[in-house]
């Protein structure tokens, strides 16, 4: 159980946030590639990192997610637009919309 929830933290063990991050980033990257393909944009070198945190909210505990797109070869504006478009179609994004805070960013 995570330390934030009163547990020992289990150093070296995979925690629920890491598992959620792995699933969300993989799903979002696939959505990003699909959207980019429709728009004829080359994202062969693209990757997505999900940073997931857990903390107290008004009713107990909640998640917070930052999705970071690594989109070499695209202008920042293009990359931001693709991230937004992928967020609209990604199944994880749809499932969490309105339930948790999700921020999108593009890596430098």
Each model region followed by its residue ranges:
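Extended beta-strand/beta-hairpin segments
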Residues: 1-25, 29-108
């Amino acid at each position: 159980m995570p330390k934030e929830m009163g547990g020992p933290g289990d150093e070296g063990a995979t925690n629920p946030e890491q598992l959620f991050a792995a699933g969300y980033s993989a799903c979002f990257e696939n959505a990003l590639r699909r959207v980019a393909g429709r728009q004829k944009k080359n994202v062969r070198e693209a990757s997505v990192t999900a940073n997931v945190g857990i903390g107290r909210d008004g009713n107990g505990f909640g998640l917070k997610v930052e999705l970071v797109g690594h989109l070499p070869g695209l202008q920042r504006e293009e990359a931001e637009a693709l991230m937004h478009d992928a967020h609209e179609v990604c199944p994880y994004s749809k499932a969490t919309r309105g339930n948790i805070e999700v921020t999108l960013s593009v890596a430098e």
